[in-house]
Curated annotation (Swiss-Prot):
This is Endochitinase A1. The active site is at E174 (proton donor). Residues 338-631, 743-799, 813-855 are annotated as: Disordered. It catalyses: Random endo-hydrolysis of N-acetyl-beta-D-glucosaminide (1->4)-beta-linkages in chitin and chitodextrins.
Length: 888
């Protein structure tokens, strides 16, 4: 199956090359467009299948290192990422998105179609973007080259798009003067020169006023390839003034003169236009007929300088259909009509297929003292029509393998190891000198339950677990096509239960033992649920039909008994309600003393539309105009969710108390809209008297593609929490009634967002006021913090059992290629200020989840759009991530 997928995708990608013309940077009829900030925007691959586009600017890298946590840049690509970000070794949560699988998949499709993809720096938000020193400028460029340029052997920093390489960088600087950008551009040029076999490009998007306050210095002192002027923000020089001279003077002629006297004298000059009437302020939009008059005039007047048209932005063009074609198509037709020597294309048909990379499976255990990630690329792909949203748990980052470290203890240890392989999964052998129970529920690869961790491009296997006492191991497996459980051997009684819900097929491996063995394998294909009978009387195993729900719960039950548990096992899938799926695994063991039964009950679900976060509202298509609400709810209820329980049965020598540390999040309102706050609190209780709980639910979820969501109401408000109803005026385009569940007091709680910041950036020229066009000097850079080792692993004593359950939850629709948060890791990147492609410090390439549970970032940057009206912020309400740590 893997080889056939590889063959199919290789054929599909190869077919793209002859169907699209080769990119010609010297052409006068190129069409550039911005993408990444459109409301409810389609995937990048959709626009790459449009033959009208030649250059696509992905926006934005919008947080600059001198003003950003950890001195890392940050990014925002609208709805195309899952919200996960990188965290440094110092524990600093950065703003650099790590879960942008769709973009990583789609860029190669664009490049195969002959299009150039540039990464845009800037945008209109946040307004504090600036560079404080020459060293900071060099280090900023070095970081971006290491993270998004060609894969360098010495680079130890993040790779948000994996091994995918962008074709260059765009500067859309909107704030705080032009200091440092010439240095950045010249640093990029030095890196470009180190890769002579590939052509990279630099572009800039100044306002039409001369000189532009932000980019004139960079254009004059560094060589850019493309200059697309925003002819829609300033009335005095806008493109509309070419049509109506009473508005001002269209100054394309003046810009040609400026370029000829600068380091960018060979740059192509583009006319920047809004792609619809709503993409900029009123009065700046030009009809196709008006554009044709302008293009024919200046293409004929400056045939060596005129480069084409730039549009803000892709979604606005897509929504502006004229005679059945998007605005971009009309612009391309105009350019080709006016160009006396247009480029030759062999065909206009581009297959609309979207490959999804699939890593090769791994069936061997890889013992390691820490989680290890190694780069061994072996990508494969499968085609999925881009016109239909498809939810998939297929890993999308090729070439990594992960392994969990071995666990050894003299006391009972419960281990849960999610495994998400590309096409197959295998659990590691579990051996013990005492009783061993193993339960391995298998969930199909097509499942989109929000409880399924997505580990991009990982062939994963768990390492052996050995113990001198009882060992309970639960290994949820999410395979692409098939799943199998590994042998379980023991010198004592062994009970094994493997409920399997396969995508295509499932098989159970042999279970061997020198004593009695109980084994049952209920297979649940689709929604038809058979039941099975275990080999040993006294136990039972059954499965009932599982129905998805929008209320995920996580429950851990520990039962302590003074007498040995019966030598039988029970595994069942229980219908909690008419719309809830429950996976239950019970693993009894028989140590010499009192037995311990660990029962992990996980209720996870997804609605019929596979939603995984609740969208309260979305920004409009203008990137800067007034916000319009397209999916707002009149009433929203949010509350924290975390459930834990423990019971003690039988006589014990001393009372049993349980200390529970609950880490939970709740939704609050800040001056800009919704915000997610993470809090931690501790409670100690006797299982026989009460339990520690924190429950939550979201009521009245919005309707999705499959219909309205079912309404669920929480039975009670958790102790220590209170419910409040308020009117939020900044959460959507219209006032919205919001029901919030908030903690009564924050006393004793710790916010996980409060992390110590590393040392501030160093370097000369702090906060300069005058721009400088000096070339980089190769200083030491602004990232000066020293590498910090990963946090120490929690030590488990012989009298303590620790079970950790992490269940990311949300109710927003999953998009093909995205997933939930990633496994934990640590990163520390200190790029060198010297353009050598090397980086000091160490980091892991595996992103970790953010401290907030953001599922798909909303557009925050307006970039090359109008700067007069308010920003168009899409609002996303996300439900909670629960991390409960139970200590007995």
């Amino acid at each position: 199956m893997v080889s056939s997928k590889l063959s199919f995708v290789a054929t599909a990608v190869a077919a793209l090359a002859p169907l699209a013309s080769a990119f010609d940077a010297s052409s006068r009829s190129n069409l550039a467009i911005y993408w990444g900030q459109g409301p409810n925007q389609l995937r990048l691959s959709h626009f790459c299948q449009e033959t009208s586009l030649d250059i696509i600017n992905i926006g934005f890298i919008n947080y600059f290192p001198d003003m950003s946590p950890g001195h890392w840049p940050g990014s925002n690509f609208g709805n195309q990422c899952d919200g996960s970000v990188y965290v440094t070794n110092d524990g600093v949560v950065t703003k650099l998105l790590s879960g942008c699988h769709q973009i990583m998949e789609d860029i190669p499709i664009c490049q195969a179609a002959g299009k150039k993809v540039l990464l845009s720096i800037g945008g209109a938000y946040p307004p504090d973007q600036s560079i404080l020193s020459e060293d900071s400028a060099v280090a900023f460029a070095t970081f971006l080259w290491g993270a998004f340029g060609p894969v360098a052997e010495g680079w130890e920093g993040p790779r948000p798009f994996g091994d995918v390489v962008v074709d260059g960088f765009d500067f859309d600087i909107e704030h705080n003067g032009g200091f440092g950008y010439a240095t950045m551009a010249n640093t990029f040029r030095q890196y470009f020169n180190q890769v002579p076999e590939r052509k990279f490009y630099l572009s800039a998007a100044p306002q039409c006023i001369i000189p532009d306050a932000q980019l004139s210095d960079a254009i004059f002192n560094a060589a850019f390839d493309f200059i697309w002027i925003q002819y829609y923000n300033t009335a005095a020089c806008s493109a509309k003034s070419f049509i109506d001279t009473s508005l001002g003077t269209f100054n394309f002629d003046a810009w040609v003169t400026v370029l000829k006297a600068s380091a960018s004298k060979d740059a192509k000059l583009y006319v920047g236009l809004p792609a619809s009437e709503t993409a900029a302020n009123q009065g700046y939009y030009l009809t196709p007929d008006e554009v044709e008059s302008l293009v024919s005039t200046y293409m004929d007047r400056y045939p060596d300088t005129f480069g084409g048209i730039m549009l803000w932005e892709a979604t606005a063009s897509e929504n502006n259909q004229i005679d059945g074609a998007p605005y971009a198509d009309h612009m391309k037709d105009i350019l080709l009509h006016c160009d006396p020597s247009p480029p030759v294309t062999s065909s206009s048909a581009i297959p609309s297929s979207t490959p999804v990379t699939t890593p090769s499976p791994s069936s061997s255990a890889v013992p390691s003292s820490t989680p290890a990630v190694s780069e061994t690329p072996s990508p494969s792909s499968s085609a999925v029509p881009s016109s239909t949203p498809v939810a998939s748990s297929t890993p999308v980052v090729p070439g990594t393998s992960a392994s969990s470290s071995p666990v050894s203890s003299s006391s009972a240890v419960a281990s849960s190891t999610p495994v998400v392989p590309g096409t197959s999964a295998s659990s590691s052998p579990v051996s013990s000198s005492s009783a061993v129970a193993s339960s391995t529920p298998v969930v199909p690869g097509t499942s989109t339950s929000p409880s399924t961790p997505v580990i991009p491009g990982t062939s994963a296997s768990s390492s052996p677990v050995s113990s001198s006492s009882a060992v309970a191991s639960s290994t949820p497996v999410v395979p692409g096509t098939s799943a199998s459980s590994s042998p379980v051997s023991s010198s004592s009684a062994v009970a094994s239960s493997t409920p399997v819900v396969p995508g295509t097929s499932a098989s159970s491996s042999p279970v061997s033992s020198s004593s009695a063995v109980a084994s049952s394998t209920p297979v649940v294909p689709g929604t038809s649920v058979p039941s099975s009978t275990p080999a040993i009387p006294g136990g039972s195993s059954s499965s009932s039909e599982a129905v998805a729900s929008s209320t995920p719960l996580v429950t851990l039950t520990l039962t302590v008994s003074p007498t040995p548990a019966p030598s039988s096992s029970e595994s069942s899938s229980t219908d909690l309600s008419s719309s809830t799926q429950t996976d239950v695994g019970t693993a009894p063991s028989q140590p010499a003393g009192p037995s311990t039964t660990a029962t992990a009950t996980t209720s996870s679900s997804s609605s019929s539309t596979d939603e995984s976060s609740t969208t309260v509202g979305s920004g409009n298509g203008n990137g800067s105009g007034s916000t319009t609400t397209t999916a707002a709810t009149d009433s929203i209820t949010a509350a924290p969710t975390a459930t834990s329980s423990a019971t003690a049965t039988g006589a014990t020598s001393e009372p049993v108390t349980i200390t529970t540390i609950i880490v939970t999040s709740y939704i609050d309102i800040c001056p800009t809209g919704f915000t997610t706050v993470t809090t931690t609190y501790t409670t100690t209780y006797c299982p026989g008297t009460n339990t520690a709980t924190a429950t939550a639910t979201v009521t009245n979820p919005p309707s999705g593609p499959g219909g309205a969501g079912s309404q669920t109401t929480a039975p009670t408000v958790p102790e220590g929490w209170t419910t409040t109803v308020t009117i939020c005026t900044q959460c959507a385009a219209k006032p919205t009634t919001v029901t919030l569940t908030l903690p009564v007091t924050e006393t004793g709680s710790t916010s996980t967002d409060a992390v110590p910041a590393p040392p501030a950036a160093t370097g000369e020229g702090s906060n300069p006021t005058q721009p400088s066009g000096a070339s980089p000097t190769g200083g030491n850079g602004s990232f000066s913090e020293e590498p910090v080792p990963p946090p120490a692993v929690t030590q488990v004593s012989t009298s303590t059992e620790i079970v950790t359950l992490v269940r990311p939850t949300s109710s927003r629709p999953l998009i093909l290629g995205t997933g939930t948060v990633h496994p934990s890791s640590t990163l520390a990147v200190k790029p060198s200020a010297k353009p050598s492609g090397q980086n000091s410090g160490s980091s892991s390439h595996v992103p970790i989840p953010p401290s907030y549970t953001q599922e798909a970032v909303s557009p925050l940057s307006t970039g090359a759009a109008s700067r007069v009206t308010g920003l168009g912020h899409g609002l996303v309400l996300t439900v909670l991530t629960l991390s409960a740590f139970f200590v007995l």
